[in-house]
Amino acid sequence: MTSRAIEGIDADQWSLTRLGTTGFIGGEAFYTISQAHPEIEWTSLVRNSDKGAKVAAQYPKVRLVYGDLDSASLIEEESRNADIVCHWANADHEGAAHAIVKGLASKSSTSYLIHTSGTGILLYKDIDSNTYGEASSHVYNDWDNLSDVTNLPDHAPHRVVDKIILQAGTEHADKVKTAIVCPPTIYGRGRGPDNPRSHQVPELTRCTIQQGHGFHVGAGKTYWSNVHVQDLAQCYLKLVEAAINGGKPATWGPEGYYFTENEDFVWGDVSQWVATEAKKQGLIKDDKVQSFTKEQADGLTTWGSAMWGANSRARAVRARKLLGWEPKCASLKDTIPKTVAYEAQRLNTEPGHAAKAAGEA
């Protein structure tokens, strides 16, 4: 194994275990980290030989172990053998989180756990009040009043596993250094071995093409924050490098909570951008945007009402302040044409489809 110093960090002899490599976030994060530090020894948990083949084709030196998030004993063992565990898989799987913590806590040396949550955790107020499509002025941040984020109610999405990670970073603070990365709406194409597609905006685009018109939930005034997947991956890279550097300059444990975001957007605006572009590409006939109810949105995709109709606003102060992280990629709006074209391709919908369907071409 060749040792390389990247920005003063020598990563030789560090071993990392990762969960979620073939997913959208994990695929891009691993691509970014492996490009910066090819000398790191990686172990990847994959579900089956098909997934394993895709990882091996792009990363032939990666050690593969086969199992899923229910393979508690395997995850515990692999975590015990790792210096750093990057958890990019299901943010709501309690068993996997417990297994990782158990494995890391059993080590005599200090290790690091970088877990992925999501700002869906901030949706609970609108869900509780059954309010969809209305704007909220409440903006969380990960620096001032961090306890507001780390003490959200237990029924908030992702909160149960967040608590497992936060508790581990407190009870085992001497041996298990934890960080939670909490991304908002993610956009852009991933460069991982399997899934290059995000969810919220692509799903909105898919449904727009299939419905033949744009739509938003309720009044369409809901706010979310957003981040390009490549900018998100840079945050993971900086945390991995901090871990290799003995933890500095990052904070860990109770203060190891990192939002990532570029800016806020309004879902009604995104709906219009998508509809306008879909019409421009000849995929729909009219770019008017209709108002859908909560039930209609949920009928289009799981959690449609929440992810398009509830508010989730956050500021990434900690990563900027401590890690020097800054988003640099294209804006969400700038990526809409490619997203529309990609979703049309996935649906086997050719440009000019709307005119053909109407008998005008």
What does each model-found stretch correspond to?
Residues 2-39:
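N-terminal Rossmann NAD(P)H-binding glycine-rich loop of SDR-like oxidoreductase domains
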Residues 25, 85, 232-236, 260, ...:
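Non-catalytic, hydrophobic alpha-helical segments
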Residues 40, 329-361:
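Amphipathic terminal alpha-helices
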Residues 78-149, 158, 164:
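NAD(P)-cofactor binding segment of oxidoreductase domains
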Residues 162-192, 202:
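Conserved beta-loop-beta element that borders a ligand/cofactor-binding pocket
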Residues 174, 188-202, 239-257:
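Glycine/proline-rich active-site loop of Rossmann-fold NAD(P)-dependent oxidoreductases
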Residues 203-230, 235-238, 250:
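A conserved pocket-lining segment of Rossmann-fold NAD(P)-dependent short-chain dehydrogenase/reductase
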Residues 249-250, 257-313:
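Terminal hydrophobic/aromatic helix or amphipathic segment near a protein terminus
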